Design a protein with these regions (language model features):
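Flexible, glycine/threonine- and acidic-rich loop/arm segments that mediate assembly and lattice contacts
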Residues: 1-318
Length: 318
């Protein structure tokens, strides 16, 4: 009977399940779930940085005129771009010679071992990317994803995001709302104020993500009749409450900072994986000094933003 080639099975299965990796990561994070359902997963084909076009000023040539009065044709810089660094991540599926040649016998046992290793690696990638999405980007010596704590900051008047210095450019500052000892009594007022601060005409927050404390405060503030969940196919698999037209989501064990609630206009947030480096396996590597082999699964990309003023965060100042 032919010996089952575990190393080839690992490589082949990982190649076939590359899309499963990407989907698993997206579905394991509330923000990525929303971005995926709304078409804001935009792959990037390469370059020194990930360039995200943005709009930061109105066109100054607008004017009322009469008869033969001339138009204002002066050039106006309306669009600029933020530049985000590529962030890379990897998880490794490995097996030793003992597992391949001694302990694993038969195709069924081989496939079971393979499935467990792949499942574990998918969960590991999902959990760590999710933590990165909500991070301040300083983890792993600043190699972590540029997450919400960096882009929608408690202090948006300082720091550089996407190559733009917020101390110099007020258009690149998010909205903030804070109070000491926020409770279920005081939170609704802060949420109303934040909603209005982030709104521009019909342009409003689409998703509100909160840690367990702020989510519970909001939940407790609602009457039974108000505790409405909406049938939104874009957030399938997530239990949500409603605040006006936005879903309110608790994203547990995700790295959300304590006592924070983010108001996200997801029209201006993007998940930008590299076109060909999005949870894909590399070629098998054989260890030089061990009886083992490994297959890395790699990712390159980042979270980007095109409009900071339409985003906001509520946090406790105590």
């Amino acid at each position: 009977m032919a010996t089952v080639n575990l190393t080839e099975l690992v490589a082949t299965t990982l190649r076939n399940r590359s899309k499963d990796y990407a989907d698993n990561v997206s579905k394991g994070n509330a923000l990525l779930t929303k971005l995926s359902s709304s078409g804001n997963v935009k792959s990037a084909s390469g370059g020194r940085t990930i360039v995200q076009e943005l709009e930061y000023a109105e066109n100054a040539t607008f004017k009322y005129y009469s008869g033969y009065e001339t138009f204002d044709i002066a050039p106006t810089d309306v669009f600029d771009a933020a530049e985000y660094n590529w962030k890379q991540a990897a998880v490794v599926v490995s097996a030793s010679g003992l597992e391949v040649n001694v302990m694993t016998t038969g195709k069924e046992a081989t496939l079971n071992l393979l499935e467990k290793r792949i499942s574990n690696s998918m969960k590991t990638m999902r959990n760590n990317v999710s933590i990165g999405i909500y991070s301040d980007g300083t983890g792993s010596s600043s190699k972590q994803i540029t997450g919400l704590q960096a882009q929608i900051a408690d202090d948006p008047t300082s720091g550089t995001v996407g190559g733009i210095n917020r101390a110099n450019w007020s258009f690149w500052r998010n909205q903030i709302g804070s109070a000491a000892n926020i409770s279920s009594t005081t939170l609704p007022g802060l949420m109303k104020a934040m909603w209005l601060a982030c709104q521009r005409g019909p342009d409003v927050a689409k998703l509100i993500v909160a840690d367990s404390i702020r989510f519970t405060d909001y939940w407790d503030s609602l009457t039974t009749i108000q505790r409405i969940t909406r049938e939104d196919k874009g957030m399938m698999g997530w239990e949500t409450l409603a605040f006006l037209s936005a879903e309110v989501v608790y994203d547990g064990d995700s790295g959300l900072p304590a006592e924070h609630m983010y108001f996200l206009n997801t029209d201006y947030l993007f998940w930008r994986p590299h076109t060909s480096v999005n949870m894909v396996p590399l070629d098998r590597r054989d260890s030089l000094n061990q009886d083992a082999f490994l297959v890395p699964v790699v990712f390159a990309g980042n979270l980007t933003m095109s409009n900071a003023a339409r985003q906001g965060v509520i946090f406790d100042s105590a």
